[in-house]
Amino acid sequence: TCAVLQALVNRSLSVAAAKCDPDYIDPMFHSRIIGAKSSNLDPFFFDENTLRFLLAQNASGCDVTVIEGVMGYYDGLGLTSTRASTYELAQKTVSPVVLVVNARGAALSVLASVRGFLDFLPDDRICGVILNGCTAMTYAPLARVLEDRLGVKACGFLPNLPDCALKSRHLGLVTAAEV
């Protein structure tokens, strides 16, 4: 998420950010990158109208808002529900979704994974995909096939960058001030 935010800032866009859940650490990273407050949008605690109000309030005066999801796209409460999931948040806020998919060491299997997301539930709101962990050499052909076969936009890739990995402590939580 921080890489996407930085890429948008580098393109001189005014950016807002939010996190799907009550986590306070991710919004601290967002704020550090974009130089503005990031908010939380939690479909467990807030109803649809409140979520839309908070999103509009946070996005005021910005060109784009990036909402970081939680866990897997459809993962909600109790392992068998989409309640409080990123999917539910996208539904309630009518937000387009760019899915980030692990593409490290894979080729056409990435398309099978994306197809599964597209077919799993109706109105998934997925309009684009970012391939995580692939190289420039594998991205170009995968992007073409992704768009041709699945009709979903390939929005870019994030290569494996070991020097950019964050060290973890406790439960893997490191605050922005510690980086």
Tell what function each PLM region has:
Residues 1-2:
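Glycine-rich phosphate-binding P-loop
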Residues 5-93, 101-125, 136-141:
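ATP-dependent carboxylate-amine ligase catalytic core
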Residues 97-100, 155-156:
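Short hydrophobic alpha-helical runs that function as membrane-insertion/retention elements
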Residues 99-102, 130-132:
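Conserved beta-strand segments of the P-loop GTPase G domain that flank and frequently precede/overlap
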Residues 108-179:
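Internal gly/pro-rich beta-alpha loop/helix module
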